[in-house]
């Protein structure tokens, strides 16, 4: 990993995505945002070090997207943290889809710790 680690936030809640982006940029990350619809376009042009994805993306299913990413040779090694306000999130994690999961609402410091753990960044 050269330079700033890149985080891709896949979230349809614009306010949450922007607040998370701002926090992570302060912590010296490069941050990309997708609402899910343009995810594959972004991945064609960028290789993030980690993906943070909401399980519920409007009409899209974050769990299915995660499964597709883990089956694709180009993206299967990218760690994915799933976010959800619902208990069913643990199912996505248990299916070996996600590498981590965080329940909403969450503290940004909790998210940072999970990112640092999964991409091996010292605090």
Task: Give short role names for the model-derived ranges.
Residues 33-50:
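Acidic, metal-coordinating helix/loop segments flanking the phosphotransfer/catalytic sites
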Residues 106-117:
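C-terminal output helix
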